[in-house]
Amino acid sequence: MIRRVTSPALFPPPTYSHASVVEAGTRIAFLAGSVPLDAEGKLVGEGDPVRQAEQVVADLEEQLRAVASDLAHVLSTEVYVVSGDTAVLSAVWEVVEASGLSTGPHSSTLLGVACLGYSGQLVEITATAAVPDAGPEVRS
């Protein structure tokens, strides 16, 4: 269902692929940005990008569960971090690597940005995932 591609002509990515290919007819879920808020809408990990990344990945897992998918079926992500410091970006990426997102490995882009949508928010991940055929119907 998912074919992960790494081009031998390019620098080998450490924990992601250059592209993900899915066959026509596969159900695809386009997920809204996962943010570091708890179920009551309160910010988790204020001032701590690593803690926020952990919450974002946990919330992403819930989003995927709601569409009958999981981290292993993620095709592509964009990881946004409010920082221009590569050490901070690397620390957030380590959380991504430690999660099931690195199982694929999926294609990904890591970006340092000026700000995100919620006050105090430092991390956000958007994702596209395949939805396995054998999964239950998607909840609405």
List each model region and its residues.
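Short, polar/acidic, helix-capping and beta-turn segments at strand->helix junctions
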Residues: M1-S140
